[in-house]
Amino acid sequence: MNLVAYSTPKPVLQKLISRFGHLPAGQGVSFSQSYGPSGSQARAVVAGQPADVVFLSTGLDIDSLVDAGLVPKRWTKAPYGGIAADSVVAFVVRPGNPKHIHGWKDLLKPGVKVVTPNPFSSGSAKWNVLAAYGAMRKSGANDHKAVQLVTKLFQHVVSQDPSGSTAANTFFSGQGDVLITYESEAYAAFAAGKQGKLVVPKPTMLIQLPMVALKNAPGAAKAFIKYAHAPKQQRIFAATGYRPVVKSVLKRPDLAGWRKKYDTGPAFKIQDRLFGGWLKANRVWFDPNEGRMVGIERSVGGPTH
């Protein structure tokens, strides 16, 4: 079975795959795994890369597979809306938080150097951009002012890698003062021994991570997705830094520490009126010809593809 995923969840997916092989539905099933920037992965599948299950970082990337006739149009009608796990947009700062970064406006302070991926290749980066804009709007800025503040934020960006994982590698190699990333990416880095401090800004954005089977995938693909939503596997997500979509698993005593970590207050969503869903948000912000990020990137000399 061919599993194509964005770069960040490789450790948790390998745990799920290992356990799946011990179940009746997984016996005799071997996996070919591919990891990379979410947008690049989606484009590769459209271009013919073999895929049975995709786990990508935005619904927008799944919709591109729908447009190519590879995924059912009603994929969001699946249990949990087709989402396998959640996260939120968060910051990682240096140990001790020497720049005193606690919220979005702190990223705009003189001398603060920010690391975030390139939104024209990385789904993580798209979440980061929309989270920054949404936070400014939620804090009282009108649309024009919020766009100005996002532009100012990108004047502080010192590195735009192609994916969330490579951006994290850049930060942990010593570049920048703050990394904008998935909360789950931060926990994965800490588990691997990287040094830093997690800051979940208020407000922030809920990241919804879709996992779907392609139209012509074998039955084992749907079985794997069902398995990924079962409580035991959702506990694996929860204990690996992802917010489970099966919320009841957080009631378990062994996950009490994670439950406390995930209790960071409400988060706004891509479906909110402020964004109007992925299709509208992508058109407004990331269209390669007219999107707001094209102008912002050009103004700071950043990449636009």
Model-derived features: where do they sit?
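N-terminal segment of the mature folded domain
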Residues: 1-121, 255
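Bilobed "Venus flytrap"/periplasmic-binding protein-like clamshell domains
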Residues: 8-14, 119-144
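Alpha-helix capping/helix-boundary segments
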Residues: 9, 60-61, 167, 184-186, ...
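Periplasmic-binding protein-like
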Residues: 83-88, 150-154, 161-162, 191-222, ...
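Short helix-loop capping/hinge motifs at secondary-structure junctions, enriched
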Residues: 96-102, 121, 134-142, 216-221
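Extracellular/periplasmic juxtamembrane helices and adjacent flexible linkers that interface
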Residues: 218-305
